[in-house]
Amino acid sequence: MSFALGQRWISDTESDLGLGTVVALDARTVTLMFAASEENRVYARSDAPVTRVIFNVGDVVDSQQGWSLQVEQVVEDQGVYTYLGTRVDTEESGVALREIFLSNQIRFNKPQDKLFAGQIDRMDNFVLRYRALANQYQQHKSPMRGLCGMRAGLIPHQLYIAHEVGRRHAPRVLLADEVGLGKTIEAGMIIHQQVLTGRAERILIVVPETLQHQWLVEMMRRFNLHFSIFDEERCVEAFSEADNPFETQQYVLCSLDFLRKSRQRFEQALEAEWDLLVVDEAHHLEWHPEKPSREYQVIEALAEQTPGVLLLTATPEQLGRESHFARLRLLDADRFYDYEAFVKEEEQYAPVADAVTALFSGEKLSDEAKNKITELLSEQDVEPLFKALESHASEDEIALARQELIDNLMDRHGTGRVLFRNTRAAIKGFPVRNVHLLPLEIPSQYTTSMRVAGMLGGKLTPEARAMKMLYPEEIFQEFEGDESSWWQFDSRVNWLLEKVKAKRSEKILVIASRASTALQLEQALREREGIRATVFHEGMSIIERDKAAAYFAQEEGGAQVLICSEIGSEGRNFQFANQLVMFDLPFNPDLLEQRIGRLDRIGQKRDIDVYVPYLTETSQAILARWFQEGLNAFAETCPTGRAVYDAFAERLIPILAAGGGEELEVIIEESAKLNKTLKSQLEVGRDRLLEMHSNGGEKAQQIAEQIAKTDGDTNLVTFALSLFDAIGLHQEDRGENALVVTPAEHMMVPSYPGLPYEGATITFDRDTALSREDMHFISWEHPMVQGGIDLLMSEGVGTCAVSLLKNKALPVGTILLELVYVVDAQAPKRSGISRFLPVSPIRILMDARGNDLSSQVEFESFNRQLSPVNRHLASKLVSSVQHDVHRLITASEAAVEPRVSAIREQAQRDMQQSLNSELERLLALKAVNPNIRDEEIEVLEQQIKELTGYIAQAQYQLDSLRLIVVAHN
């Protein structure tokens, strides 16, 4: 290397130092000053890791004074260059710029500049960059984007609802599935899609206080969405950052109570401009035409201000008609303006539903049904379909006509677009519940303490006394102190120990009402029989609960028993277990359903055993009988439970408080009657049309199958592991489909997106991720993959490389130039551009004559024939063919332009076809179905107009290139 004072060089190892100047030389060392970063470096002259910076004719260079020069001639004098040319700003020609006055901030961002400046990257990084671009393009184009990456089983009806709603602009819908069908997951999938496509950036979730943590965990664990819980304390803290605390976070979760109690916080939440509002347990919002409740008014005000609204609620029949109307009013007050009109309109749908039921069961349509259908759909639409149904056509044709008729009716169906409701009856795949009621003898210690408590508890209300009598172990401890070991003699504990020992190979979930009971049961199992158990209660932090859940889920060396308190178990599901023990009983049928729902969920593969050990001659025995004989609540889901409970509570509570009573048999008999009546009313009121629409039928199956195909994508595994390698993460195989990924010392960036500081255990397998909550489920949508790709792009990894092609059929020294261009439309994410024109890579492979060989030579197979070159040799090779590389880059533009035009045209076609057909459908429906909002149509028209402009203006640029030189050995 020959150095001279005033020459400009850049560092190969620290490219962020900027442009350096040689300021001192002696026999063995050279000193460079990097003015941009105010650093000096002293290198050995013989092998300094620096590259000489020389610009060529045609380049534009910046001076230290801030003006730029278009280079027309390069003059050398004793190893130092002067550039002659025209100033870009004043257009003055013949200007000279000595290299010592070049701007210190010059960065080599263009791939060709980096190549000539010797900042040559590793070959495998170039390959990784190209694969990242290609994979990202595929992901953005996929119609399933936003549905593949969540940690949830592939359950057709959930995927259908999420796919249907998640793609809408500002969806306003009511999710009213029965319990155990996964409304929270549906809402999460919709949020996830809206976030990924840029349709929603600010989201507010309002839930009952007890469910805050459940939502926080579900959003984080299943969808990698990090919400912040806002309460008074958090708002006071956030006040220092902004006047409105709600503006300090994009994703906020808070309780309805919090907004109801504080007018100031409610008003701040209103002003914070959300894109999407999600309300769980919306059936608790009370409404009467004259007097809506405060809670209802809070949500109503938020729903008026927010474009997208998801309400999660119990089934409409459980709510009653008026209450159901009140929910719909929140979604669209213009459409659902009057309760009487709504009832009339609903009644009109009854015959339609009958007609559809007839169609579904393949019966012939009666004339009355035909007339009814013709009233709803125009005659020219339905006549040919009726003919097809009655002709002797093939089964397929008849099925097609039937489906088309049903689809048309669905679209016109009053609330089909705003209401989704699945029932267990309409969805297959639920386990059978085997109920084991086990009457056990009451220990004498309990009899005594309960008798004394009965004498002393004179001041208690019947309800408080009834509650107390349900938990004899607590009464005993009141007298004997907390340390007393009731579990030494309680017959339920003895039974539990025997059951656990008999079922050594099974995981067993035990639920008790109180945290203290759960903790003491764990102690009993451990001390009396050395059984591995873990506890789960409301006093534990989320991380502690996660650890307990993971310990329970572990196949080998995990806990056999998990003991939960009532509140602690909310929202946690353990489908991998099928043994449930209720150590005591809750007061409320809904809580009972919630307990069984921990295991009895869609996705449970086996039948469930429900064990109810209860003490005879206690309130537990009465409650067990009432649940079993009055409601059949153990064996079946009980949507009517609450209504029956409300009807009999006044008569039932005194009996529970007294531990028995004459009237019990009558109450059980009457409860069973009322339950039967209510259930048959529900059955009659079942809206078949709505159910068919909600579970998505064939279409739902196809979506699930399509996503299942992408699971286990080996391409993802290879790509993700290379990506982690390139960025410098440490990987360790843990078996059982698991890897541990931790930050290493020499990482490209100080912290890696989506990876906790202490590292994470990851899996690419959906089933493993479902049974192990402590693992991250890695998919193309996971922040660790998305963030890693963004890092590659922004840090300029792999933008230029040099490789050798060992091929004796070609002369030594033959060169090829592989160029990757990207087509990019500069448009806001929320415009939806990525569906039609995401960043699109175009690969060009130029031979020395300037021919494009990319169509004959595929990337992966070509790459396998190449081998890497060390940086020093690579720099020499580049210097020797610099002129040819310039020529080929210029020639490649002619090859890339027609492909860019083709990409633009294809994107326009896709966009017009997709959005115009959606627009035509909405306009046609608007004529017959008042549920189509004007705003939806306006937004679509506007979107088509904007996207047409964005796509037309899409530009291309050179993203990366690789020089390939032929060698023979």
UniProtKB/Swiss-Prot annotation:
EC number: 3.6.4.-
Gene3D superfamilies, A to Z: 2.30.30.140, 2.30.30.930, 3.30.360.80, 6.10.140.1500, 6.10.140.2230, P-loop containing nucleotide triphosphate hydrolases (3.40.50.300), Tandem AAA-ATPase domain (3.40.50.10810)
A single GO BP: regulation of DNA-templated transcription
CDD domains registered for this protein in UniProt: DEXDc_RapA, SF2_C_SNF
Ranges of residues in domain Helicase ATP-binding: 164-334
Locus of motif DEAH box: 280-283
Annotated keywords: Activator, ATP-binding, DNA-binding, Helicase, Hydrolase, Nucleotide-binding, Transcription, Transcription regulation
Protein residues bound to ATP: D177, E178, V179, G180, L181, G182, K183, T184
InterPro entries tied to this protein: Helicase_ATP-bd, Helicase_C-like, Helicase_RapA, P-loop_NTPase, RapA_C, SNF2-like_sf, SNF2/RAD54-like_C, SNF2_N
An annotated Gene Ontology molecular function: helicase activity
Helicase C-terminal domain: residues covered: 492-646
PANTHER family: DNA ANNEALING HELICASE AND ENDONUCLEASE ZRANB3 FAMILY MEMBER, SWI_SNF-RELATED MATRIX-ASSOCIATED ACTIN-DEPENDENT REGULATOR OF CHROMATIN SUBFAMILY A-LIKE PROTEIN 1
Free-text function comment from the UniProt entry: Transcription regulator that activates transcription by stimulating RNA polymerase (RNAP) recycling in case of stress conditions such as supercoiled DNA or high salt concentrations. Probably acts by releasing the RNAP, when it is trapped or immobilized on tightly supercoiled DNA. Does not activate transcription on linear DNA. Probably not involved in DNA repair.
Family, as annotated: Belongs to the SNF2/RAD54 helicase family. RapA subfamily.
Self-association state and partner proteins as the record states: Interacts with the RNAP. Has a higher affinity for the core RNAP than for the holoenzyme. Its ATPase activity is stimulated by binding to RNAP.
Protein name: RNA polymerase-associated protein RapA
Native organism: Vibrio cholerae serotype O1 (strain ATCC 39541 / Classical Ogawa 395 / O395)
